[in-house]
């Protein structure tokens, strides 16, 4: 009963009470857009109304429908009132969707200011921006990885050319504009009519939304874009012609029908007024796309919609199952993972099978990857105490825990802690600090404490306090990790980076002084122009430009023009290249160069294999004695490759900074050559670039008046090659305490002294409420620096800067053959559930962020709101700040920083998840406390308690032990082994 009341409370708080009628009964309903009986499914605006059954979710491990978060209590149906006022509509998601009865497809309707994204799992992605009437199709197939603009209909998938089959693309619509399906008649029925106007529009790309200074890809055929005045500034602006008959406007509604007929994907688009006017335009925009019959068929349709109103942010994700060929018990486990809000369905599904102790011959195991099945026994044998035999490591962990407790004090109200002052350091803390640094020296391999003097108790305390202040918003596990950076034990801590750079800028001349602006703009090739028209586009044709044909960039859920973070995909080759530490040696140029080549190998289909940095350091034709004290550049890296024609793996010749300067080793028979069949290409002579053999560099200063072009170059190279080398100025900017999770807004310099790698990019909203974009940068200072070795920096930097923080970017021009032999197949479970990235949901919020509607919540208000919500019965991911030891320690660090503003921006986001199968709807919910919470790869707040009263206990157990289990093959299984009372379920975390 408690969970029953909690669900009703949440639903009635989230949605307008006048729109949602809270009852305890299921209610039959139609889709609201077509005639009864012609569509099946639920309405997008509802919270669980089902035409044929009640909502419900399943308990972990159970194949019978039950509630996964309320320990067996049924989840009540919440039905939608059929009438609502215009003001009430603002409170709910107005995008409504329903399955078609006679076709494999979906009908979506709503007002013209509502946007949504649709996936035809596992292949097709459709992004619908109704405000600009911009519909874009992408595909996850390796051969067809870019975008098609619905409007352009030019037969172009950006860099890939497609064969067009003649057919009418725009038809007149007969009958009601509701698009009712009658018998065998197609949705939004067609009749012949005149062709739609043809415009010379290239395929549009939805790129990262950003502020006026941010990058924005040109979206051709956008209704909001305007051409320049023809006769001066006083002339009226003229909108470019559109290649669509139906253009969304305020006050109108849209209807989109997507369905499969034989081997053709058909999309129909219609705009109409709120009242059906018989004199209204009766044209329907229709596009048809051939799909490859040999590919895995579509198994489900997933639709995402977003709504923000009065500080409440709703994300609704609905998964419509199209078939039932997956065994029921397997589908139940997987759908539970989806409903929990877990992005990594495979990891969660794998954990569920392991926790349930199913043997590897169970039918559900065939939906996992081959590696998991083949290593079944090893995974099951993994224990939580694998490393407990390392006594020094154990004592170091214990010492860090003691210091964190002793460095904070509790005030008289016992509700707020702060860092102690220097004069408050007692003898026990002094002893612990010295013991801590002694233990750290024993395990440290970077040479920090061997080459610089160790500080006394006061030095160490001040260094740690400075670290805690700069990382005030980190959780306890992250802080413990940062305490393993040996720099905190130095007497003069700023000396730490003196020998951790090592870039010497090469002397090169510009091959082309003049910047060809058109090189970086989207433009149509002659083939594109020939393909303009209306009809059927071949989605599986393989003609493609040379620069992308040879790279496997099919992971566009994790890396595309809007955002790119392959680190969030645990199965990706690049995410398995662990951060390295160059040690006390000026070798950043080697680590940045070799990582760039490693990611190129990943994008060519090779296994994640590290290149030996020590081999490159020692195999050069010069003096060896000062090799660790003088830097160089990526040009020398390429020269060494060409001179020797060999690159061993890191495992063949491991890096140790003390060995830098030795003689070049003799290649042994068992060593692997990672440069086998590789070639360094000649100069490309790119405009506005510095060129060497196998090397192209772009200085940001040359793009001062066109930084968008500079950004676009980097994005393109990261998408294709996995990374670029970046030159930056680290001196007096980056130290041991540098925060990696916050986006740094930094100026640059006219010179550079350090080489790093740009590995991705994303979007954020700054403290002023402006939409901005950032680079994800990988450093070579070890995993205890920054955000596990990475940091974020604003793409454009402050407006007053003379130089961008990224001084230059470098791209290798090398030829490596594609390796198709070792390409691993995705787990079969992703044929039924979307392989999603946390970045996708964060980007969904970002694209719809309205600066004028942002709402601020204090931390106190957050805690009060969470108390009202009760335990985590229905809401997945409820905030548990302040509960348990771990939570307390985390909050003390937050409050001790003395932030300039006690009221921080906390945007409450509620994620409603629905799984619709066989007319039944099962529902889950998750609450995020802020936008960064949306972006997290894991969250202990998704812990599940079989008895709801133990929820906080389960979350605390997860937080305390996460570091122990994080690197295990199945962290959820590891946590379950630590739950000796069997009170919790951790597969959702």
Curated annotation (Swiss-Prot):
The modification Phosphoserine is found at residues 167, 858. Glycans are attached at residues 168, 310, 820. The record marks 588 as: Ancestral active site. The modification Phosphothreonine is found at residue 541. One of its GO terms (biological process) is proteolysis. Residues 208-245 are annotated as: Interaction with PTKL. It holds the Pfam family Peptidase_C1. The active site is at 754, 779. May interact (via C-terminus) with PTKL (via SAM domain). Belongs to the peptidase C1 family. Plays an essential role during the asexual blood stage development by controlling the kinetics of merozoite egress from host erythrocytes. Specifically, prevents premature rupture of the parasitophorous vacuole and host erythrocyte membranes. This is Serine-repeat antigen protein 5. It comes from Plasmodium falciparum (isolate CDC / Honduras).
């Amino acid at each position: 009963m408690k969970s029953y009341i909690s669900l009703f409370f949440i639903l009635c708080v989230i949605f307008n009470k006048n729109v949602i009628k809270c009852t305890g009964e299921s209610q039959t309903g139609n889709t609201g857009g077509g005639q009864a009986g012609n569509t099946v499914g639920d309405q997008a605006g509802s919270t669980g109304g089902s035409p044929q059954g009640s909502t419900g979710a399943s308990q972990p491990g159970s194949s019978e429908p039950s509630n996964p978060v309320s320990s067996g209590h049924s989840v009540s149906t919440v039905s939608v009132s059929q009438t609502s006022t215009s003001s009430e509509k603002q409170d709910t998601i107005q995008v409504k969707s329903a399955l078609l009865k006679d076709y494999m497809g979906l009908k979506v309707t709503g007002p013209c200011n509502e946007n949504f994204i649709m996936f035809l799992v596992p292949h097709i992605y459709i992004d619908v921006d109704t405000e600009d009437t911009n519909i874009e199709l992408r595909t996850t197939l390796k051969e067809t990885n870019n975008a098609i603009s619905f409007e352009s209909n030019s037969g172009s998938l950006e860099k890939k050319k497609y064969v067009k089959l003649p057919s009418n693309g725009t038809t007149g619509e007969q009958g009601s504009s509701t698009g009712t399906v009658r018998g065998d008649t197609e949705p939004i029925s067609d009749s012949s009519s005149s062709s739609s106007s043809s415009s010379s529009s290239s395929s549009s790309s939805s790129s990262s939304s950003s502020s006026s200074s941010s990058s924005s890809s040109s979206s051709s055929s956008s209704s909001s874009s305007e051409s320049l005045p023809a006769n001066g500034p006083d002339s009226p602006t003229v909108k470019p012609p559109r290649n669509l008959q139906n253009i969304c406007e305020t006050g109108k509604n849209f209807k989109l029908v997507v369905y499969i007929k034989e081997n053709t994907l058909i999309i129909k688009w219609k705009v109409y007024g709120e009242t059906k006017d018989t004199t209204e335009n009766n044209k329907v925009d229709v596009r048809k796309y051939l799909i490859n019959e040999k590919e895995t068929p579509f198994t489900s349709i997933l639709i995402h919609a977003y709504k923000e109103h009065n500080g409440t942010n709703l994300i609704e994700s609905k998964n419509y199952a199209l078939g039932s060929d997956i065994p029921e018990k397997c589908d139940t486990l997987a759908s539970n993972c989806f409903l929990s809000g877990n992005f990594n369905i495979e990891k969660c599904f794998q954990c569920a099978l392991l926790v349930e102790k199913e043997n590897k011959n169970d039918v559900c195991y065939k939906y996992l990857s081959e590696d998991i099945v083949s290593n079944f026994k090893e995974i099951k044998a993994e224990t939580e105490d694998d490393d407990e035999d390392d006594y020094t490591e154990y004592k170091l962990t214990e010492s860090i825990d003691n210091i964190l407790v002793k460095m904070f004090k509790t005030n008289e109200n016992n509700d707020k802690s702060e860092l102690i002052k220097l004069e408050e350091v007692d003898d026990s803390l002094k002893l612990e600090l010295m013991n801590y640094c002694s233990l750290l020296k024993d395990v440290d391999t970077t040479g920090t404490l061997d080459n610089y003097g160790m500080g006394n108790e006061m030095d160490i305390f001040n260094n740690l306090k400075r670290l805690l202040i700069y990382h005030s918003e980190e959780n306890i596990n992250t802080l413990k990790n940062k305490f393993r950076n040996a720099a905190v034990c130095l007497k003069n801590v700023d000396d730490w980076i003196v020998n951790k750079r090592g870039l010497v800028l090469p002397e090169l001349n510009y091959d082309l002084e003049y910047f060809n602006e058109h090189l970086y703009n989207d433009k149509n090739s002659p083939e594109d122009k020939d393909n303009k028209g209306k009809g059927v586009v071949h989605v599986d044709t393989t003609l493609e430009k040379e620069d992308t044909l040879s790279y496997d960039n099919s992971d566009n859920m994790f890396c595309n023009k809007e955002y790119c973070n392959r680190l969030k995909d645990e199965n990706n080759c690049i995410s398995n290249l662990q951060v390295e530490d160059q040690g006390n040696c000026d070798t950043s140029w080697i680590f940045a160069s070799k990582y760039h080549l490693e990611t190129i190998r990943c994008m060519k289909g090779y296994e994640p294999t590290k290149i030996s940095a020590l081999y490159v350091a020692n195999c050069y034709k010069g003096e060896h004695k000062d090799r660790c004290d003088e830097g160089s550049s990526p040009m020398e890296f390429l020269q060494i490759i060409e001179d020797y024609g060999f690159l061993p793996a890191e495992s063949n010749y491991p890096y140790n900074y003390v060995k830098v300067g030795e003689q070049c080793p003799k290649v042994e028979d068992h060593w692997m050559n990672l440069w086998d069949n590789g070639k360094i290409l000649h100069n490309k002579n790119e405009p506005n670039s510095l060129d060497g053999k196998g090397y192209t560099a772009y200085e940001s200063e040359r793009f001062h008046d066109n930084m968008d072009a500079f950004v676009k170059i980097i994005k393109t190279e990261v998408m294709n090659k996995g990374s670029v080398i970046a030159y930056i100025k680290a001196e007096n900017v980056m130290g041991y305490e540098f925060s990696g999770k916050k986006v740094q807004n930094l100026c640059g310099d006219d010179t550079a002294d350090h080489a790093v790698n740009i590995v991705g990019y994303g979007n954020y909203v700054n403290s002023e409420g402006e939409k901005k974009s950032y680079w994800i940068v990988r450093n070579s200072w070890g995993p205890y620096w920054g955000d596990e070795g990475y940091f974020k920096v604003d793409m454009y930097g402050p407006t007053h800067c003379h130089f961008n923080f990224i001084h230059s970017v470098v791209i290798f021009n090398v030829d490596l053959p594609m390796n198709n032999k070792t390409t691993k197949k995705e787990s079969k479970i992703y044929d039924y559930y979307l392989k999603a990235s946390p970045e996708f949901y964060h980007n969904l919020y970002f694209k719809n962020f309205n600066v004028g509607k942002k709402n601020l919540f204090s931390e106190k208000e957050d805690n009060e709101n969470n108390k009202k919500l009760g335990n985590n019965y229905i809401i997945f991911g409820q905030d548990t700040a302040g509960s348990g030891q771990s939570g307390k320690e985390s909050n003390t660090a937050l409050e001790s920083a003395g932030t300039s503003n006690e009221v921080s921006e906390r945007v409450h986001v509620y994620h409603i998840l629905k799984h619709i199968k066989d007319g039944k709807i099962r529902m889950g919910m998750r609450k995020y406390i802020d936008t960064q919470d949306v972006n997290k790869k894991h969250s202990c707040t998704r812990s599940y308690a079989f008895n709801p009263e133990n929820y906080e206990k389960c979350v605390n157990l997860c937080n305390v032990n996460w570091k122990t289990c994080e690197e295990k093959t199945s962290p959820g299984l590891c946590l379950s082994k630590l739950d000796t009372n069997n009170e919790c379920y951790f597969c959702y975390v």
